[in-house]
Amino acid sequence: MEVIEVVYEDGVFKPLKKIKLKEGTRGVVVVRLPKQISEIAKKYRIKVREDVLEEFLEERR
């Protein structure tokens, strides 16, 4: 199995790099969309005491 990054344009998946396949070769495409930044941030979030957060917000005003 090979992972190939593609862009979808005009109803066609187009590879972003040159690939070595014979014309007419068939395969299966699995679409995995890039994660949103909010999903990535959830992985690294930590709990903060509410009073510390309030103090931080006050300093920013």
UniProtKB/Swiss-Prot annotation:
It comes from the Archaea. InterPro entries: AF2212-like, AF2212-like_dom_sf. Keywords: Toxin-antitoxin system. Disulfide bonds: none annotated. The keyword Cell membrane does not apply. It holds the Pfam family AF2212-like. SUPFAM superfamilies: AF2212/PG0164-like. Possibly the antitoxin component of a type II toxin-antitoxin (TA) system. Belongs to the UPF0165 family. This is Putative antitoxin PYRAB11980. The lineage of its organism: Archaea, Methanobacteriati, Methanobacteriota, Thermococci, Thermococcales.
